[in-house]
């Protein structure tokens, strides 16, 4: 269950795995690290200060341990990197029983490298991970979404939309051991020389196990 940008299990492109998210990007711009553990609604860190700099990283890590606590981590940086060579936005959420959701969305107007990853692992129910990258004119676009849950209802979604990018990769990886694992990955490139979309799903042991994956890409 590994694909183009090495998102397998519960770790994705920029090494946000489990409940700790470490994204050490060298450069002279902004780093916004928000980490919370064992709380009802942990951290939502948003960074809008990615001007034209060499590197910019926004890490939001949320971990909750006990039952009936919904740890959600949401990180949105929209349109904030003008001409940045490296811009990363990662969101990681881990909860051991119920309702761990992680969402990461990256919108870059003109960045040469833009990656958005959402990693989510939950031990029991209702684990959903969504990652979306939209670039207007970027040479490299990576969007990876990785979700692993031990029991029920694991769904991952990864989407990349490129207007004029030379490389566009979208990968979605999901593994669940019991029921209802669905992955969907789509990559649309209007004028890109390389466009890759891969989706892999594996489920192991259950009385009724459903696994569906759909992948579509188009380049002009």
UniProtKB/Swiss-Prot annotation:
Provides the silk fibroin thread with a sticky coating. Acts as a cement by sticking silk threads together. This is Sericin-2. Residues 1-220 are annotated as: Disordered. The gene is SER2. It comes from Galleria mellonella (Greater wax moth). Keywords: Secreted, Silk protein. Produced exclusively in the middle (MSG) section of silk glands. One of its GO terms (cellular component) is extracellular region. Residues 156-165 have a biased composition (Polar residues). It is found in: Secreted. Its main location: secreted. Residues 1-131, 141-155, 166-220 have a biased composition (Low complexity).
């Amino acid at each position: 269950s590994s694909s183009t940008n090495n998102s397998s299990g519960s770790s994705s492109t920029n090494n946000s795995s489990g409940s700790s998210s470490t994204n050490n990007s060298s450069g002279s711009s902004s780093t916004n690290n928000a980490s919370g553990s064992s709380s009802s609604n942990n951290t939502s860190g948003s960074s809008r200060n990615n001007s034209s700099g060499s590197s910019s990283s926004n890490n939001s890590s949320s971990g909750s341990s006990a039952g009936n606590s919904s740890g959600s981590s949401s990180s949105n940086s929209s349109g904030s990197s003008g001409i940045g060579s490296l811009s990363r936005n990662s969101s990681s959420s881990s909860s051991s029983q119920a309702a761990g959701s992680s969402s990461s969305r990256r919108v870059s107007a003109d960045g040469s490298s833009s990656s958005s990853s959402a990693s989510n692992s939950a031990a029991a129910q209702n684990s959903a991970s969504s990652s979306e990258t939209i670039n207007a004119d970027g040479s490299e676009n990576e969007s990876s979404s990785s979700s692993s849950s031990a029991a029920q209802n694991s769904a991952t979604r990864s989407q990349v939309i490129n207007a004029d990018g030379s490389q566009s990769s979208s990968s979605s990886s999901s593994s669940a051991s019991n029921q209802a694992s669905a992955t969907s990955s789509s990559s649309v490139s209007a004028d890109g020389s390389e466009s890759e979309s891969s989706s892999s799903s594996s489920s192991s042991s259950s009385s009724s196990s459903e696994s569906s994956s759909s992948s579509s890409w188009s380049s002009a």
